[in-house]
Each structure stands twice: as structure tokens, then as C-alpha cells.
């Protein structure tokens, strides 16, 4: 059992699964019903994830065949776009760094989850790969994403490539968008 200032070792020898939340759970000294409700929802999804019932790292994503196929197709499309942009503008490698810094464990969903987190998508819902993508599209700043469009068409300037390098998380969102 772990708590603030308390760590007790498992002396029973029984198999134990440690469940940790990806998200900041708020102030423990100040009780807020909304925060408690949010934490219970996140804890439920963290438990399902720990026992392999759902996938994702930050978001609760369905692990069924359709959602998994969508995740695989998404990652393949993302990798193709990223490779094409990286070959034209090597400075955009910072999107790779943003993805690594996000420390997402589900490789197929990592770009989508990192972009959704940066866009402020609510983690207390159960998603399929498709509905998480739709939630991201609804939450992201479309004008800002469109400002990176010349990088994808090959008509970009050095200034736009530099902006992508300076804003790796935003550029990662644009790659997902």
C-alpha cells in the first residue's frame, strides 16, 4: 500500500498489481466532490487497464478488434505523414521528441493520446480509437492546426518549419490532425 508518506512492502508474498494513475489527481487535503468523482472514474479505468481489459495509457480506449484495427491504421497513416514531412523538413524531428517525452506505452495510440492530452480531451470517458480521434478534432484549435498545412503540402517556408520545431507538441497535434 502506498500513500502520502506511507510505503508498506508486500510481506505476504502474494502477487500484487500496483495501479497508478497517469493523471494528476488533485489536492488530497481539500475534499471536492467533483474531483472525487473524477478520481473514481479515472481509478476505474486505471484498474481495467492494469488487468488488460482496455488499452491506452492516458485514455480508456476499447481493446476490441474494430478499435484495435483503427489504432493500427491510424499509426500507419501517422507514420507515413510524419516520415514524408521529416524528409522534407528535418527540423521537425522535435515532434518525435514530444512523443517520447509523453511516455505513452501503447505505441499505436501514443500520438493520438499525446495530441488529445495537449488539446484537453476529457480522460473520464470510455473511447474507441475513432471516438478519441473525434474528441481530439473537436477540442483542437483548427486554425492553429491549419497553420502547419504548408509543411504537409511541401510549400512551406523555413519559418514555418522553425515554428514546428519550436512548438513540438502543437506540431504533433497537427500531424495527428
What is each residue range found by the language model?
Residues 1-177:
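Patatin-like phospholipase
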Amino acid at each position: 500500500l502506498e500513500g502520502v508518506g506511507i510505503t508498506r512492502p508486500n510481506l505476504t508474498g502474494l502477487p500484487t498489481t500496483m495501479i497508478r494513475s497517469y493523471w494528476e489527481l488533485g489536492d488530497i487535503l481539500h475534499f471536492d466532490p467533483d474531483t472525487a468523482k473524477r478520481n473514481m472514474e479515472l481509478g476505474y479505468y486505471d484498474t481495467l487497464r492494469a488487468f488488460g481489459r482496455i488499452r491506452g495509457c492516458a485514455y480508456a480506449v476499447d481493446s476490441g478488434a474494430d478499435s484495435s484495427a483503427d489504432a493500427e491504421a491510424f499509426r500507419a497513416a501517422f507514420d507515413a505523414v510524419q516520415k514524408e514531412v521529416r524528409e522534407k523538413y528535418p527540423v521537425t524531428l522535435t515532434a518525435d521528441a514530444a512523443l517520447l517525452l509523453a511516455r505513452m506505452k501503447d505505441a499505436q495510440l501514443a500520438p493520438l493520446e499525446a495530441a488529445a492530452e495537449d488539446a484537453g480531451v476529457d480522460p473520464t470517458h470510455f473511447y474507441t480509437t475513432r471516438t478519441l480521434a473525434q474528441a481530439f478534432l473537436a477540442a483542437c484549435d483548427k486554425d492553429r492546426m491549419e497553420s502547419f498545412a504548408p509543411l504537409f503540402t511541401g510549400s512551406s517556408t523555413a519559418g514555418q518549419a522553425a515554428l514546428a520545431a519550436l512548438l513540438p507538441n502543437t506540431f504533433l497535434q497537427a500531424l495527428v490532425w
